[in-house]
């Protein structure tokens, strides 16, 4: 098995996770209470699996190999595309965590909106990102 096969399998796991994120957002929109603990688990999975484990492999190994073997085209694609999208996903996760912290202190609708917006932004951005890979 090639390392890229493992990374493709990780993409499948992440796609399943993203479907669950969107489903949870829909449940809240449909009137169910906002499950703070479940959204905290989203933050944890996003950081530990999607970012640390998966994006870490890309950033530490795959991207270097791509630049070595494909040259300037890969360098531009990685530095002006893939890494930018990784950082955007990280930003969505930070925003989600910040909104959760505010909501727990003061459960206002505006913070609930911020939670759903950050979670959906993360899910949409990462889904598009993986589809390009």
What are these regions (language model features)?
Residues 1-132:
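Small-residue-biased structural context
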């Amino acid at each position: 098995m090639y390392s890229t096969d493992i990374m493709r399998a990780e993409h499948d796991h992440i796609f399943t996770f993203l479907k669950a994120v969107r489903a949870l957002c829909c449940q809240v929109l449909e009137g169910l209470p906002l499950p703070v603990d479940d959204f905290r688990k989203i933050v944890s999975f996003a950081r530990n699996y999607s970012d640390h484990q998966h994006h870490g492999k890309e950033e530490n190994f795959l991207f270097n190999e791509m630049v070595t073997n494909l040259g300037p085209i890969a360098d531009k694609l990685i530095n002006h595309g893939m890494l930018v999208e990784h950082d955007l996903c990280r930003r969505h996760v930070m925003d989600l965590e910040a909104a959760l912290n505010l909501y727990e202190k003061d459960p206002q609708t505006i913070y609930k909106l911020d939670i759903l917006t950050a979670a959906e932004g993360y899910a949409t951005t990462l889904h598009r990102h993986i589809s390009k890979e």
